[in-house]
UniProtKB/Swiss-Prot annotation:
GO terms for cellular component: cytosolic large ribosomal subunit. One of its GO terms (biological process) is translation. The keyword Ribosomal protein applies. It holds the Pfam family Ribosomal_L7Ae. It comes from the Archaea. Belongs to the eukaryotic ribosomal protein eL30 family. HAMAP family: Ribosomal_eL30. Keywords: Ribonucleoprotein, Ribosomal protein. This is Large ribosomal subunit protein eL30. It comes from Pyrobaculum neutrophilum (strain DSM 2338 / JCM 9278 / NBRC 100436 / V24Sta).
Length: 101
């Protein structure tokens, strides 16, 4: 099993990750992310938007098993993170989380 918190850190340090709902939504509409991660407590409207557009674009969505506060902590950020998009995983194996879903 992939340790999502550790792999997220590696992706943030060696790859390209977009943080924030609006930025993630724009990236999904452009079809550029390789993976979208949503906090488990994301509002239904936000989750519905991202999941709908991600399905159309063929982008996998992973629901982080924790709140937006915990996702922010996993990303070593001092704020909540509802959504993020992995554009380039770098040296991480974060894309393997979708294999276990």
């Amino acid at each position: 099993m992939v340790d999502i918190s550790r792999e997220l850190q590696v992706a943030l340090n060696t790859g390209k990750v977009i943080i924030g709902f609006e930025e993630t939504k724009k990236a999904v509409l452009a079809g550029t992310p390789k993976l979208v991660i949503l906090a488990a407590n994301a509002p239904k409207w936000a989750r519905g938007d991202i999941e709908y557009y991600a399905k159309l674009a063929g982008v996998p969505v992973f629901i982080f098993p924790g709140s937006s506060i915990e996702l922010g902590a996993a990303a070593k950020r001092p704020h909540k993170i509802m959504a993020l998009a992995v554009l380039d995983p770098g040296q991480s194996e974060i894309l393997k989380v979708v294999e276990h879903v």
